[in-house]
Amino acid sequence: MLLSPSLLLPLLLLLGAPRGCAEGVAAALTPERLLEWQDKGIFVIQSESLKKCIQAGKSVLTLENCKQANKHMLWKWVSNHGLFNIGGSGCLGLNFSAPEQPLSLYECDSTLVSLRWRCDRKMITGPLQYSVQVAHDNTVVASRKYFHKWISYGSGGGDICEYLHKDLHTIKGNAHGMPCMFPFQYNHQWHHECTREGREDDLLWCATTSRYERDEKWGFCPDPTSAEVGCDTIWEKDLNSHICYQFNLLSSLSWSEAHSSCQMQGGALLSITDETEENFIREHMSSKTVEVWMGLNQLDEHAGWQWSDGTPLNYLNWSPEVNFEPFVEDHCGTFSSFIPSAWRSRDCASTLPYVCKKYLNHIDHEIVEKDAWKYYATHCEPGWNPYNRNCYKLQKEEKTWHEALRSCQADNSALIDITSLAEVEFLVTLLGDENASETWIGLSSNKIPVSFEWSNDSSVIFTNWHTLEPQIFPNRSQLCVSAEQSEGHWKVKNCEETLFYVCKKAGHVLSDAESGCQEGWERHGGFCYKIDTVLRSFDQASSGYYCPPALVTITNRFEQAFITSLIGSVVKMKDSYFWIALQDQNDTGEYTWKPAGQKPEPVQYTHWNAHQPRYSGGCVAMRGRHPPGRWEVKHCRHFKAMSLCKQPVENQEKAEYEERWPFHPCYLDWESEPGLASCFKVFHSEKVLMKRTWREAEAFCEEFGAHLASFAHIEEENFVNELLYSKFNWTEERQFWIGFNKRNPLNAGSWEWSDRIPVVSSFLDNNYFGEDARNCAVYKANKTLLPLHCGSKREWICKIPRDVKPKIPFWYQYDVPWLFYQDAEYLFHTFASEWLNFEFVCSWLHSDLLTIHSAHEQEFIHSKIKALSKYGASWWIGLQEERANDEFRWRDGTPVIYQNWDTGRERPVNNQSQRCGFISSITGLWGSEECSVSMPSICKRKKVLLIEKKKDTPKQHGTCPKGWLYFNYKCLLLNIPKDPNSWKNWMHAQHFCAEEGGTLVAIESEVEQAFITMNLFGQTTNVWIGLQNDDYETWLNGKPVVYSNWSPFDIINIPSHNTTDVQKHIPLCALLSSNPNFHFTGKWYFEDCGKEGYGFVCEKMQDTSGHGVNTSDMYPMPNTLEYGNRTYKIINANMTWYAAIKTCLMHGTQLVSITDQYHQSFLTVVLNRLGYAHWIGLFTTDNGLNFDWSDGTKSSFTFWKDEESSLLGDCVFADTNGLWHSTACESFLQGAICHVPPETRQSEHPELCSETSIPWIKFKSNCYSFSTVLDRMSFEAAHEFCKKEGSNLLTIKDEAENAFLLEELFAFGSSVQMVWLNAQFDGNNETIKWFDGTPTDQSNWGIRKPDTDYFKPHHCVALRIPEGLQLSLCQEKKGFICKMEADIRTAEELPEKGPSHSIIPLAVVLTLIVIVAICTLSFCIYKHNGGFFRRLAGFRNPYYPATNFSTVHLEENILISDLEKSDQ
C-alpha cells in the first residue's frame, strides 16, 4: 500500500529521520543524538575558532549557537561532492554570475552554479580557489582571500570529511547497477538517502538520476540491515546449505564496485567452496550464457589468490587460458556458466555482472578462529615442539611428498595440517629457529577439478597461498603443497620434489595455572595481555598506573590477530575503542611507539583503518568493531577509550629490539645518502620503453629484487623529493608510481606499502578523496602523494635495502652508471688522468667532456662531485684554450653562455702553455690548469631527443580548382552526391580522384582530420579515404601513416562476420565515419572495397605554377564565428581562467563548452590557425576526478591529449591541435573562446511507463525493456513474449531513437551482441519493412546496409553491434527488446507513483564476441579519452539527442584561409 503525503508529514518532522521539507523544532544536541545522526552521515558544521555552527536560511547562511538544534544546521555529503542541507533541501553552491557573493543554497541539479566541494586541512574549498569563510556580521560567505577552519560539532575536533559520501550501487531495477544519485527528487521532494516511499513491499530504493519522474531510472539499495534478518526478497536461498545468493546479472560494475555492493548488504562476492556449490550456481544459470564477477582476487601484494569473504581457497576450476605471469594485469576472478572450466581472470577495472553471497550463520567460523589464539600449556615427548594442544617435529631429511607422508605415519603422526593464522605463526617460528626455508605440509589434490585436502582427512578451514598461487600444472594428476619460512605462505609443487617436512600429533594439555600470566591476563607468545575496560584519555591510559607496565605495542600481523580476537570478547558496542602505545604527541609528523617508562621503539607493523592516519599530532586507538582491530588517530586528551595492556611473561625479560643500519654502499646506479637503510632508482620515460601501470611497475621492481618505493621515515621522503628535483625540471609536473596502495579488499580500505613496511605518517593528510577506485598513489616532486587509478601508466621509483644486491634481469641492458639530469646524462670518472685522455675516453663513449650552461646544471654537478671527492679534488670540464692566452671555449663547440670562474683563476699571469678548465669540488668555482695535470673528470652525452626541431624546406602555397577546399598546401574535394545512386565504391572513388589529378585523401595530422570532419557537419554518409587493409601502414599516395584515428569498434584485417554467409577473404578499404550511430564521428573503419553507397574525399597538391598566395595572411581571423548553429567569440588577451570567465560574461557569452566531435573539430582548425592555446570552460574541484563545464552543460565528450593531461591543474585549455590540457587556473594564456550556449528545452514527453512484470525505460513517447536483451529466445518466442507484455518487438524509426538504443546497450558491455528486430522482407518490391508496414530508412543504418540478396525463408532481421542490420536463422536464440507506447498520464496525475516493485527476472550475458568486446572497451580507448571514461562516472550512460542536422554551406562561412572554396 502506498503512503499518502499527509501520513508522511509527521515522519518528516522527526529528527531521527530527516527529510528536509520542514523547519523542525529546537532540540538539545545530546551526544546520543549526534551519534545517531553521524551514523547516517549527517553532521553539524562548527567554526573551529568561533565555536558556532552554520545554519542555512532562506537566502543567507549564518553562524548560530550550536546547541539550538534545527534541521537547517544539519548537513550531509551527497553525490558528486555536494553538501546537502537537510532543512533547506538544497545544496551549497557558488553562482559565478553573482561574484559579489556567490554562496547560497541552490537546487541540487542546478546547471547554473557549481555544487562541488572538497576538504583541505579542515577548510571547505570550491572551484576557482573559493573557500567557505565568515564575514564580520557572522554571515557565512565564499572568499578567495582568507581561510577558515571548520570541524564537525561534537566529534572532538574531527573534520567533516569523516562523513564523505560513498556510492551505493543499485540492485535490480532498470539502472544496470548504476549508483544512487543523492539527493534525488521524487514526488516533489528531495531525498538524501534511500527511501521506502511509494512501495508496498517496504524495500529501500533510490533513483540514479536527480529527478525520478523525468528519467525513471531506479534500483533497490544495498540494505545493511538485511544482514541481521537473513535473506529478503532480492536474495535466493539454497535450502541445502542455508546460504543466500543474489544474482545481479543486469548490472555492469568493476570488481571493486561489485565487492562494495555485496559488502553493504552484509555479504560478499561469490565464493565457491566445492563442486556441489559450483553445480548449484551453474544450474541456476543453465539457460543463460554469462560471465560474472566472483570474490576471487589477487590484490594482496604479499599473498596469492584469495576469496574476498575470507573463505579458504582449496577448490579450483581454472580455465586453461589463465595466465599466472607477474606482469599480467588480470587479478580478479570470474565465473562463466558456458564452459566446463569456468574460472577466468580479468582486469579488475572491467565491468561485468556479479553474484553476491551471504552466510546465514558465521558464528561457527568465529568460534574456531577465537579458540585458535587461546593459550594452552602443552607437554610433548622429547624431540617434539609443543604448541596449543599439539606437538610438532621438523624432519631435516629431504623426501618426496609421499615419502614424507609415510614417514610421519610411521611415527604415529601425520604431515602437518594448518588450521589458522596462529598455527602459521608457530610454523614460521619453528622453521626460522631450525634455519629451514621450505617444508612439505599435508595438503594435496588428485582430483579434477582441483580440490586440495589434508592428508589426515581434516576439513580445510584455512588457506595461506603465496603470490601467484595456487598455480595448477596442466596434465598432472596430483599436486602437493609446501610452506615457505618467511611468511608461511603455501606453494603448489611437483610431488616428486624433495623437501624437509613437519609431522604433527596431539599433545598433553596442562592446566591453565601454568600459562605464566597473572589472573585476568591472556598469554600470546612471551607476553601477557589485559583489557582495562574503564574509559580514559590517552594521557591517563599511558601513565603506567592504570595499565601497568605500559600500553600495548604491536610488532606483527600475528600479534594483531591475537589482539583482535581478545577484544572481541569484551566489545558490546559498535563504537568501542582501545588505546595502544602509538602516538605523535610532539607533532613530528611520524607515529612511533612510546610505552610509559620505556625507550621509544621503532614501528615494525601498522594496521590502520580507512583514511588513517588522518593527521599528525594525535594518539592511536584500536577500533572494536566495523572493522575490528583497525587503528585510528584520536585526540590525546579529549577522546576517551578503554586500554590494552601488555607485559612480559613472568620470569622472562623483554627482548631489546636492535635496529641495524646497513652501511653497504648502493650497487650500480642505485642512489641513497648517509643514514638511509635503502637505495632508490628512478625509472623515467627517457630510460625505459614505456610508462607502466602500477602493477606492471611493481613487477618491474620485483625483477630487480626490489619493490616500488616506500617511505619508512620522513628522511626517505626528503631524499626522494631531492632526488627528483636533482634530475628533472620542477615545472614538468612528473608523476611516479610508488608502493602506496589500497588494492587489498581484505584491508578495510586502508593504504599500505607494497614492501610491507609500516605506514607511519599521514601522507594523504591534505586531501580527502572519498571511497573512489583510485587505489594506487603517485609521487610528485613537491612532496605530494596523489591517488590514481592503478591502470594508469606512469613512470616509477624502485627501492631496495642497501645490503641486498640487485638482480640483473635477462632483458636488462647493462650500462655504466650515467646520471640523468634534465635531458642529458653524466658519467663521473673518479680516477685522475690528463685532460686529453679524458677527451678521448668521452669521445669513445659517444659523449663530450662536461659543458655547463646554467646555474641549475652547475649546482647539480657541484653536489655530485662534492659527495664523490676525497681531499677536495678538482675535476676536468670541457673548457680549453685552443692556443695559449686565447679565450676559453667549450670543446664540443657550444657557446659559453654561463660562467662561474673563481676570481683570478681563469688565466694566471705569464701563461705560456695550453690550459684547460676545471671545477672545484669544494667551492664549485671554475679555474684553469695545464692540460697535462691529472684530475678526475666528467663526460656528458646529449639525449636522442634534440632541443630544437629540424626545419623542413618551406613549401609554397598555390591555388586550387573551383569547388575544392584549401588546406595548408593541399586541395581537398568532399564528394557526397545527393543522389544515392551516384554513391561510389572505393575503386570508383579512387578512379574519380585520379581523373582529377589526385588520389583519395591521406590524412596526415590531427588538424587535417579535424578540417575534414568539420566539413562533414550535416552529412550522414560516410566517406572513403586512401587506405586498404593489405597495407594499412602506407597511404595510397605512398606516404607512411604517421597519424591514425581508427575506431575502437573495428578490427584491422578481420572481415565482418555474417551468420548467413561464410565470407571469403575480401579486400577491405577505409571509411571515415560521419554517421555517429555505430562509429564515433570522424573515426576510421574498414569496409568491403566493393560496397557502394559512400562518398569520398580526394586530395591533390596546390598548383604552384602561378603566383602562390598564403590566404592566412590575406584574410585575418574574425573575432565572431558561426558554425553548426552556434556562435563563437574569440578573446585575444593575456588572461587567467578566472579573467576569461569574466570577460566572456561581459560580452554576454559564456566560456565555451564542447560537446561533440564536429564542434571540437571546428575549434581545432580555429586554434591551429590562431597559433596559440585558448582557455575553455572545463574545470575540476577534486583534483581531476570529475570535470564540469562552467556554463552548466552536461556532456561525456572529452578530447584530452593523454591521460596525464587532466591531472596537471584545475582549469583546462585547448592547444593548437585542439587537444585538452589542465593547468593552474592562475596561469596566463593568450586567449579564450566564448560562445552563446544553446537553449535547453523542457521535456516534451511527460508520459510514464506502465508497471508490468518487467522494468521499462522511457525515451520520448515509448518504453523499452532492456532487461530482455540478456534472455535468449528464437524470433517467434521473443515476439510472443513481447505480445504478452502488451508490446511489440523493437522497431527503430529515426536516428535519435537509434542513438538512444545504442547508448543504453553500451551499458551491457560485452554481454550483448545481437537483438531481434521486428522487421520483414517484402518480396514484391524487394525492400525491408517493419512489421507495421512502414519502410526502414536504410540510410540511417550505420556502416553496412542489409543485403537483400541474402533474404530467404526462415531468416529474420537482427541488429548487430556495431555493424547494423544482420540476417540470422529465425530459430537462433538471441536477446531482444520489447517496445510499447508510454502511458498518456502525466507525472502530475500520478503523485504517488513509485518504481515498479516487481523484481527484474534473472537474466544473463550472451557469448563473448571479439567485436563486442572491443565495443565494450570503446569508452576506455576512445581517442584522447584514455582512462577518463571511468573517471567521468557522473556522465555514465548519458543520452543526448542527435542534432537535427541541416546542411551548412561552409563555403560562405569563416576561416577564409582554409575553408574557402576557390573561385578559379
UniProtKB/Swiss-Prot annotation:
**Which cysteines in this chain are paired by disulphide bridges?**
53-66, 91-108, 180-206, 194-221, 262-356, 332-348, 408-503, 480-495, 619-636, 701-798, 776-790, 842-939, 916-931, 1069-1089, 1211-1225, 1282-1378, 1356-1370
Q: Where are the transmembrane segments?
A: 1399-1419
Stretches assigned to the C-type lectin domain: 240-357, 387-504, 524-645, 675-799, 821-940, 967-1098, 1123-1234, 1259-1379
State the post-translational modifications.
The secretory phospholipase A2 receptor form may be produced by the action of metalloproteinases. It contains all extracellular domains and only lacks transmembrane and cytosolic regions. It is however unclear whether this form is produced by proteolytic cleavage as suggested by some experiments, or by alternative splicing.
Renumbered ranges of motif Endocytosis signal: 1437-1443
At which residues is glycosylation annotated?
95, 456
One Pfam family from the UniProt entry? Answer: CysR_MRC2_N
- The highest taxon in the source lineage is Eukaryota
Q: What is known of its domains?
A: C-type lectin domains 3-5 mediate the interaction with phospholipase PLA2G1B.
Biological role? Receptor for secretory phospholipase A2 (sPLA2). Also able to bind to snake PA2-like toxins. Although its precise function remains unclear, binding of sPLA2 to its receptor participates in both positive and negative regulation of sPLA2 functions as well as clearance of sPLA2. Binding of sPLA2-IB/PLA2G1B induces various effects depending on the cell type, such as activation of the mitogen-activated protein kinase (MAPK) cascade to induce cell proliferation, the production of lipid mediators, selective release of arachidonic acid in bone marrow-derived mast cells.
Protein name, per record: Secretory phospholipase A2 receptor
